[in-house]
Amino acid sequence: MRIVACLLLITALFSSYGYAAITTSSPLSIGVTLSSPGGSYELGFFSSNNSGNQYVGIWFKKVTPRVIVWVANREKPVSSTMANLTISSNGSLILLDSKKDLVWSSGGDPTSNKCRAELLDTGNLVVVDNVTGNYLWQSFEHLGDTMLPLTSLMYDIPNNKKRVLTSWKSETDPSPGEFVAEITPQVPSQGLIRKGSSPYWRSGPWAGTRFTGIPEMDASYVNPLGMVQDEVNGTGVFAFCVLRNFNLSYIKLTPEGSLRITRNNGTDWIKHFEGPLTSCDLYGRCGPFGLCVRSGTPMCQCLKGFEPKSDEEWRSGNWSRGCVRRTNLSCQGNSSVETQGKDRDVFYHVSNIKPPDSYELASFSNEEQCHQGCLRNCSCTAFSYVSGIGCLVWNQELLDTVKFIGGGETLSLRLAHSELTGRKRIKIITVATLSLSVCLILVLVACGCWRYRVKQNGSSLVSKDNVEGAWKSDLQSQDVSGLNFFEIHDLQTATNNFSVLNKLGQGGFGTVYKGKLQDGKEIAVKRLTSSSVQGTEEFMNEIKLISKLQHRNLLRLLGCCIDGEEKLLVYEYMVNKSLDIFIFDLKKKLEIDWATRFNIIQGIARGLLYLHRDSFLRVVHRDLKVSNILLDEKMNPKISDFGLARLFHGNQHQDSTGSVVGTLGYMSPEYAWTGTFSEKSDIYSFGVLMLEIITGKEISSFSYGKDNKNLLSYAWDSWSENGGVNLLDQDLDDSDSVNSVEAGRCVHIGLLCVQHQAIDRPNIKQVMSMLTSTTDLPKPTQPMFVLETSDEDSSLSHSQRSNDLSSVDENKSSEELNASS
């Protein structure tokens, strides 16, 4: 699956100087406006419908007619002609009327009384601490009816928080209307518009690059939207990203309940999307088990095997009660696959469908498993295997099912056997061809048996030998000198038949076991599971690549094995296992002092330098994280797990993919949201690694302060206040080996690496120079993810060891890893 130009690099939010700002001594009054530095947006007072009521709002500058994108006091307008927007004595942004009475406040609990308010070129109104430069409040976290590029909707179940859009009451009344747009917490999430407390329209589940209930989002659709969910921590973020053609654009929830994406082409506003589009799109239009056909007359039909619950109501056009099953299910799903009785339930496939509501995500890895899983579950009424999602199942009524003219998904509906086989006409056609088909099958079976016996007598396991011979020949032709080809029984013996006692760890691609060969050499065996997202081709490419990469800071591949369905990689064994065991364990972290940690940082950097610059192959790792750094007996680091790595050719500097793979928290913003990756993506991951090594804090779980800020925010605040010296792991504070200057410099370098804009990050050669010299370092910009408190967007910053993003169908725009290149 390939995403088309979706979600280009999110432009970082930044502070700007040298232009007017709102301060205690310089308030904004009626008739005066504040412009963003580039002149894209304007903040000021406006009157709606010439009513005399004044609102503080933000709009596109130099665009007519005026488009209001945010309103501060939408619930309480100012009726007088004298009002001021200013900074209060405690640092809040406040609106005062002519009597100095408080009309609106940004709220919060500011920690500084030395603040200013600025309008950024992104359209974000921010309150800035003059001392630290931190944002104390921002309008992007308090949306109205409009989303601008870089804004997001979110939910946070543990903290009972969510960010939504709320419509205006009318086109001229900014007060909250009756429609709310949000993302749902189910997995996968979907967009939902509510009218009051009732569902009004939904987008269908998110499938990685598109909403399944919006057929317009096909391969040609330029999609400015992106979503990341963290099922483990109960958070999700849906973002409106920056595209080349969407810089001047917005998403608006209208007073009528429509969600519109609109962009400006330089002369006119163009509607890019609108939903709901037809009456069929309204939620539950045809009731339970009803099917709303966009092109149908009447629009409502019953799904196959169902009939109207009330014929009279249905004929009169009242479809709300829906349909009921015509023939009861026999539900013999627990029978074996070979059992083919006349009463066995069957599935009827309906194409071009918007998946019904109340779906559940099942853990089956392919369509056949999804089919069989639903068949065995008597409560399963339907299933759909969706590209970009996987297996969706329904265990209750099918509601809000729509049939499109084109696009959509295939819904497999469970029916009684008689619903598909009770037609005499079908039986006649079947009987007419049955005899010929049986004869043909018998002939083919006889031929097959004869060939099988010949093969058995001539040479056993020829097909298996051919397969193994083919991949061995392929590898040998690629100049993989020194690579051993292991037999499966040797690896079974070495690992005690892959005993759980030998298990070292488990990831998205399979399980790693410790083993010992007959000569006493210890090894690590990565055994790919049958449901692994890494297929044979990717497995072969990984072998070809790693076998040609030789460096002291890269894990060495000793050999491989393919035996039937078994695919195994054999690596050198690292006695100290992975880095996370040391820096996050309360006892083992005492074994690595600052000198050792600094040596590990430098070793990882040297390994990256080899991958990015010094090797004859240019490789982007894409999954650099603490658990993928292994340690030998001398605590020297080795970069491991190249299952997601990509090879760059010639002057290629970046690539993009529709299937974002990697681990949240370590993924760069441009990669997590847009699928765009480069060497700078690895640099971002390296920066996160540095901060984890220095602090002993884990990106996935650490939070501090009343706002539950994440590790990047913690590092930024510490560096801003004292150069990051207090970031050192507290267990190292009393150690003589701690070099506070060196550690502070590493914090500085780490912050340079996690800057939001890829172009601002240093390359690995510059990082190595910074680590080995004392030259002055440039000032980093505040990381984007710092601007959201971690409890509100933890889905962007949490590493998911058991929930790594690893989509199987990755149609890459550049070549797969291929050592023959």
Curated annotation (Swiss-Prot):
Annotated catalysed reactions: L-seryl-[protein] + ATP = O-phospho-L-seryl-[protein] + ADP + H(+); L-threonyl-[protein] + ATP = O-phospho-L-threonyl-[protein] + ADP + H(+)
Spans traversing the lipid bilayer: 428-448
InterPro entries in the cross-refs: Bulb-type_lectin_dom (IPR001480), Bulb-type_lectin_dom_sf (IPR036426), Kinase-like_dom_sf (IPR011009), Pan_app (IPR003609), Prot_kinase_dom (IPR000719), Protein_kinase_ATP_BS (IPR017441), S_locus_glycoprot_dom (IPR000858), Ser-Thr/Tyr_kinase_cat_dom (IPR001245)
PTM sites of type Phosphothreonine: T657
Primary location group: membrane
Ranges for domain Protein kinase: 498-785
Signal peptide, first to last residue: 1-20
GO-annotated molecular function: ATP binding; calmodulin binding; carbohydrate binding; protein serine kinase activity; protein serine/threonine kinase activity; ubiquitin protein ligase binding
Annotated binding of ATP, by residue: L504, G505, Q506, G507, G508, F509, G510, T511, V512, K526
PROSITE patterns tied to this protein: BULB_LECTIN (PS50927), PAN (PS50948), PROTEIN_KINASE_ATP (PS00107), PROTEIN_KINASE_DOM (PS50011), PROTEIN_KINASE_ST (PS00108)
Sequence ranges of Polar residues compositional bias: 796-808
Enzyme Commission (EC) number: 2.7.11.1
Full protein name: G-type lectin S-receptor-like serine/threonine-protein kinase At1g61360
Species of origin: Arabidopsis thaliana (Mouse-ear cress)
